[in-house]
Curated annotation (Swiss-Prot):
Function: Exerts an anti-apoptotic effect in the immune system and is involved in responses to infections.
The organism's taxonomic lineage, starting at the top: Eukaryota, Metazoa, Chordata, Craniata, Vertebrata
PROSITE patterns: G_AIG1
Gene: Gimap8
UniProt region (G5), positions on chain: 207-209
Limits of the AIG1-type G domain: 46-246, 281-471, 472-681
Organism from which the protein derives: Rattus norvegicus (Rat)
SUPFAM superfamilies: P-loop containing nucleoside triphosphate hydrolases
Region (G3): 103-106
UniProt-annotated stretches for the region G1: 55-62
GO BP, sorted A to Z: regulation of T cell apoptotic process
GO cellular component terms listed in the entry, alphabetical order: cytosol; endoplasmic reticulum; Golgi apparatus; mitochondrion
Region feature (G4): 171-174
Lipoprotein in keyword set: no
The name this protein goes by in its record: GTPase IMAP family member 8
């Protein structure tokens, strides 16, 4: 009987989470401590970690994935049949790292369909990128031949290094009763051998029906096991998955694959060899992008060799309203061509982009008419860059359409004489193609073939790795202002907890810079509370000293990522001291520092039924008006006594302004980053 989530005992039972406490045949090993959290956080310099769930049908992979994610994402229920039928993934931010959990069906069962297993295995490997951890999920209780076959299959696919990068997760912990996990392992020869190979510090037990508090404890201890793995395996995590023949070998499915031929074999080592395509070859995702009316859909149809995407002339509305995709074979490879709506709509909702291209396109086709005014500073680039990062340029080919409009003109001469066009081509390192929609059938096939050959070269250049979607950047918020305006209370509101001392006193409460951290809506936030600028030693008469103090504050408290200065005032009480703070900042960092500031008023509750917009527009204070103008209206207000959803709403409003601030400057200029880098002594940038 198979189940995806059956865990035995009642959910409310409080079970002690058991880790193996001693090594079996390997001596004692130190347990990863909280002080070693940086091992997980840094993980060889990358900000993303992938966890691949592997195990037999009914082992509890989906339920375990949901426990790690802290939410029910993967379908998990009792069933005689396989519940998870394809690979799927979901991400969560944990301890400052983006963790992608990949759920899989049973990939290694001798009872499964070999063709389906091969397809699932290919999809699984296509989702992987370094670094990743193999999670072998196995239930406590009666073991079957399928448990052993799973271990053999993992070894066959991932090679002799599989043990080095494996963590074993035992599900149905509640079924241990009064027994220990170590005794359970000792009672099974294959389990004992497995744990001897990987080390007892890299196994843990889950009760996926435990209450929330107990599940959080389980996940915390599970993360400790990952930290221990990272301490043991520094540097590059895994060798490349491909064999010398570019094939995947040794799945333990009872068949051998070679091309499209299925051959019986007792070696249980399926092979997919050579560069040729078969039904299990991963698709090469090619994303068509551009403004409305540039001919993306028509270009897609030409590449596919058939009319599948809707095309028509329309001046008033978009023809392509949603993402759509179709595939074709070329040169024994499968290309998935993804048509997209007008690129300006992407900034409204990035979820569709991610859904249709996950984990990322292998190539981008930037479609634009040959005589267009598309320039390097166009908003098109900032939108793509925001989702995929600067690296998208290396994956992009410009596809110029409407060559027929320039009939009789030499293309090379035309591009060289057009400075904007020449600059655009240089940015993309000379990668471009041209389509003529009045071409003959033979000419059209030739231009499509040349383009696909270029795409193939881009894919090969990146070793078949896609341009993965950019994770959200960490945001550093540096609070500045005079003493008594509520900087510490504001910091506590942003963090959602009382991290900084905040009291009503005649003397300043905050005497030194300090920081706190939280994650909200998948964005990691570091809040830096600072003492009053005029309380910093020697800064009142020496602007250079103030610059030095703030630089030191950034170095000691900020983390890598974008940094935003928030100038805090108290609503209805703008004093000469506040004005002096602004003057000090402008004197130390040049007057235009205010262009990169956000103004935040505390005591929002004093507005009563009033509106912040009316307050800022109707104020008679000339200094405040000047500040609002220089900050380009980036103003918000906090009631630091709010709690729950009202508190979160305030924080999200500030984060929206902060992210929009960076985005607006990304779209229009990069020189300001150099200015601010110089302002803090060329030690750090405000946005990185």
């Amino acid at each position: 009987m198979a189940t995806s989530s059956h865990q035995g005992a009642a959910a409310g039972s409080q079970m002690e989470h058991r880790l193996c406490e001693t090594s079996i045949g390997q001596g004692e090993r130190p347990r990863a401590s909280r002080g070693q959290e940086s091992n997980f956080k840094q993980s060889q310099g990358t900000s993303t970690l992938r966890l691949l769930l592997l195990g037999k049908q009914g082992a509890g992979k989906s339920a375990t994935g949901n426990t790690i994610l802290g939410k029910a994402v993967f379908e998990s229920r009792f069933s005689h049949h396989m519940v998870t039928k394809r690979c799927q993934s979901e991400s969560v931010s944990v301890r400052g790292k983006q963790v992608i959990v990949i759920d899989t069906p049973d990939l290694f069962s001798s009872l499964g369909c070999p063709e389906v297993q091969q397809q699932n295995l290919r999809q699984c490997l296509d989702l992987l990128a370094d670094p990743y951890v193999l999670l072998l999920v196995t239930p406590i209780g009666h073991s079957t031949e399928e448990d052993k076959k799973t271990i053999e299959g993992i070894q066959g696919v991932f090679g002799p290094q599989a043990y080095r990068h494996m963590i074993v997760v035992f599900t149905r912990e509640d079924e241990l009763g009064e027994d220990t996990l170590q005794n359970h392992i000792e009672s099974k020869k294959y389990l004992k051998k497995l744990i001897e190979n990987i080390g007892s510090q890299r196994c843990c037990a889950f009760n996926n029906k435990a209450d929330k508090k107990q599940q959080e404890l389980q996940v915390s201890q599970f993360l400790d096991a990952i930290e221990f793995l990272m301490m043991e395996s520094p540097g590059t995590y895994f060798e490349p998955l491909k064999t010398e023949n570019s094939g995947v070998q040794g799945c333990g499915t009872g068949v051998t694959y070679k091309g499209d031929n299925l051959c019986g074999s007792k070696k249980r080592q399926p092979q997919i060899t050579g560069p040729g395509w078969d039904r299990d070859t991963p698709e090469l995702r090619v994303l068509l992008m551009g403004k409305r009316g540039v001919g993306k859909s028509a270009a897609g149809n030409s590449i596919l060799g058939k009319q599948v995407f809707k095309t028509q002339f329309s001046e008033k509305q978009r023809v392509t309203e949603a993402f759509a995709s179709h595939s074709r074979l070329w040169n024994q490879k499968k290309f998935l061509i993804i048509d997209s709506p007008e690129i300006s709509s992407w900034k409204l909702d990035e979820s569709d982009v991610k859904e249709h291209t996950f984990p990322g396109p292998h190539a981008f086709l930037l479609v634009t008419p040959l005589g267009s005014s598309l320039k390097s500073g166009d908003s098109v680039f900032s939108i793509i860059k925001r989702i995929f990062g600067e690296k998208f340029i290396k994956f992009t080919i410009i596809l110029f359409t409407r060559k027929e409009d320039f009939e009789g003109q030499d293309l090379d001469t035309f591009t060289k004489e057009n400075d904007a066009l020449c600059n655009l081509i240089q940015i993309f390192e000379g990668r471009y193609a041209v389509f003529n929609y009045r071409a003959t059938v033979e000419e059209e096939q030739s231009q499509v073939g040349k383009l696909l050959s270029q795409i193939e070269s881009v894919v090969q250049h990146h070793n078949n790795k896609p341009c993965v979607i950019r994770e959200k950047e960490l945001l550093n918020i540096i609070l500045l202002g005079r003493s008594g305006v509520g900087k510490s209370a504001t910091g506590n509101t942003i963090l959602g907890r009382p991290a900084f001392v905040s009291q009503l006193r005649a003397q300043p409460v905050t005497s030194r810079s300090q920081s706190g951290r939280r994650t909200l809506d998948w964005q990691d936030i570091v809040v830096v509370d600072t003492p009053s600028l005029n309380q910093m030693s020697g800064t009142e008469k020496n602007p250079a000293q103030l610059k030095k103090e703030i630089k030191q504050c950034l170095l000691q408290n900020c983390e890598e990522g974008m940094k935003v200065f928030v100038l805090v005032f108290q609503l209805g009480r703008f004093t000469q001291e506040d004005e002096a703070v602004v003057e000090q900042l402008e004197a130390s960092f040049e007057e235009n520092i205010m262009k990169y500031m956000i103004v935040l008023f505390t005591r929002k509750e004093d507005l009563g039924d009033g509106d912040l917009y009316d307050f800022t527009n109707n104020t008679k204070n000339k200094v405040l008006k000047r500040i609002f103008k220089k900050c380009k209206g980036r103003v918000c207000a906090f009631n630091n006594k709010e709690t729950g959803e009202d508190q979160e709403t305030q924080v999200k409003a500030l984060l929206t302004i902060a992210n929009d601030l960076k985005r607006s400057y990304d779209e229009h200029s990069t020189s300001w980053m150099d200015q601010l880098k110089s302002a803090v002594g060329q030690i750090t940038t405000v946005f990185k």
